[in-house]
Swiss-Prot record:
Superkingdom of origin organism: Bacteria
UniProt-listed NCBIfam families: PRK02315.1-4
HAMAP family associated with the record: MecA
Naturally occurring in which organism (per UniProt): Streptococcus pyogenes serotype M1
Annotated InterPro entries: MecA_C_sf (IPR038471), Neg-reg_MecA (IPR008681)
Entry note about domains: The N-terminal domain probably binds unfolded/aggregated proteins; the C-terminal domain interacts with ClpC.
Family assignment from sequence similarity: Belongs to the MecA family.
Coiled coil: none
UniProt name for this protein: Adapter protein MecA
GO function term, MF aspect, one: protein-macromolecule adaptor activity
Function recorded in the entry: Enables the recognition and targeting of unfolded and aggregated proteins to the ClpC protease or to other proteins involved in proteolysis.
Subunit note: Homodimer.
Length: 253
């Protein structure tokens, strides 16, 4: 099993099929809520070295996403009453008529309404990007193996990304996560948030590099709501060059 903290309120636990089998569980056990399922979730939590803010919280909700070779469980420390758990699934009605896909969609919607919505959306965005990367890689390998599919295209030399932050503190925290080379960065102030532009050199990089880097960036930021052109014309320019480097020098209390 693997655990990753996505935000202050959300963990992602990846459980392999072997892990499920060792614990006497199957995917079908998650289709209908039962005491066995909830006990399984909490036994997994007991095995893992949880962050301090999750220990003895008692107010947890679980979102289950089945994959081909694993089970992804998103654990959210909710601000709502700790009694909100799998019993809430009663509101779904007659689940015997639901397909597994319908059930998981209903479960996801319920957790969205009661949990860390932004974290869930960001996770889904990252997962979509990485799935696209895998598909693109396989497609490129297929084209490389078949000369008849090769065609000339003009590769991009640089890519601009725009990221959003609710506060300047979030922007500083993001800057401190940057441990790779960037060509340029700018910081703007909008009407209700901060915007940062990041310029990356993608020359001599594989075609999926831009997507991979974007996925890394939005792990600690929100996808941009404005274009760089819009910010240059309408945004308040705070740092026009080296924004990341300047923010990295700021000490957070």
């Amino acid at each position: 099993m693997e655990m990753k903290q996505i935000s202050e309120t959300t963990l992602k636990i990846t459980i392999s099929m072997d892990d499920l089998e060792e614990r006497g569980m199957e995917l079908k056990d998650f289709l209908i809520p039962q005491e066995k399922t909830e006990e399984f979730f909490y036994s997994v939590m007991d095995e893992l070295d949880l962050p301090d803010n999750f220990k003895d919280s008692g107010m947890l909700s679980f979102r289950v996403t089945p994959r081909k070779d694993r089970l992804d469980v998103f654990v959210t420390k909710s601000e709502i009453n700790k009694d909100i758990n799998l019993e809430d699934l009663a509101e779904f009605g007659d689940m015997s008529q639901m397909t597994p896909e319908d059930f998981f969609k209903s479960l996801e919607q319920s957790m969205r309404e009661k949990g860390d919505v932004k974290a869930h959306e960001k996770l889904e965005k990252i997962e979509e990007i990485m799935e696209d990367v895998v598909e693109a890689t396989l497609a490129n390998q297929s084209e490389a193996a078949d000369p008849s599919t090769n065609h000339e295209s003009e590769p991009l030399d640089y890519v601009h990304y725009v990221l959003d932050f609710s506060t300047i503190t979030e922007a500083v925290a993001f800057a401190k996560t940057i441990d790779f080379s960037i060509e340029a960065s700018e910081l703007y102030k909008g009407s209700n948030c901060y915007h940062m532009t990041i310029l990356l050199d993608v020359q001599q990089q594989p075609s999926y590099f831009a997507n991979v880097m974007y996925a890394r960036l939005i792990e600690h930021a929100n996808p941009g709501s404005k274009t760089r052109a819009y910010l240059q014309e309408h945004g308040l320019q705070l740092m026009l060059d080296g924004a990341v480097e300047q923010l990295q020098k700021i000490e957070l209390g």
